[in-house]
A protein has these predicted regions:
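Viral RNA-dependent RNA polymerase
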Residues: 1-172
């Protein structure tokens, strides 16, 4: 990354280097052709103090895959986050806020609800469930007039995420 002149809106302004932009263009061209990129996802331990028996893991994408996910899915996810009672999605809602209380009251009016936050979900979640989540976002993208080409990219990208190759301590 190369720093560039800051602005009021972007005080830490930068541009991505040509090598990174070329990788992003490669990912996009492969996805547009319906070919997976098989990007490696790195699993790494969190830098936290825990008991000897507990070690928390998180997953890291490279910047090209992150760029693609954010380009195609972030506008829809942002919309869902902005309207938690409409989307019934509490990601990003402060649990000590009035918005949380409104969401709680709304959800309790209905007899069926799912608590989607459960222990070790990122280690146990099946690919089919990941793909189902992406499918919902893709259906919303269709309703938002995404092009068929963009939908195709999103579906191929979803497969790369759902069936990811994860590298942990150098092992795949």
């Amino acid at each position: 990354m190369t720093p560039i002149a800051p602005t009021d809106d972007y005080p830490d302004n930068f541009v991505l280097d040509d090598e990174i932009m070329e990788e992003i263009r490669y990912y996009e061209s492969e996805y547009r052709c319906g070919r997976r990129v098989y990007s490696l996802i790195k699993a790494t331990t969190k830098d936290e103090i825990h008991t000897k028996d507990k070690c928390r893991i998180f997953y890291v994408n490279n910047i090209a895959l992150t760029w693609m996910i954010r380009k195609y899915y972030l506008p829809i996810i942002r919309f869902l986050q902005m309207f938690p009672t409409l989307s019934e999605c509490a990601v990003g809602v402060n649990s000590e806020s009035q918005e949380w209380q409104q969401l709680d009251a709304f959800m309790k009016r209905h007899p069926n609800l799912i608590g989607g936050d459960y222990s070790k979900y990122d280690q146990k979640i099946p690919a089919q469930l990941i793909l189902a989540g992406f499918k919902i976002l893709t259906l919303l993208a269709r309703r938002c007039n995404y092009s068929e080409e963009d939908i195709f990219v999103m579906e191929t990208l979803a497969a790369d995420v759902a069936y990811a190759y994860v590298m942990f301590n150098g092992d795949l």
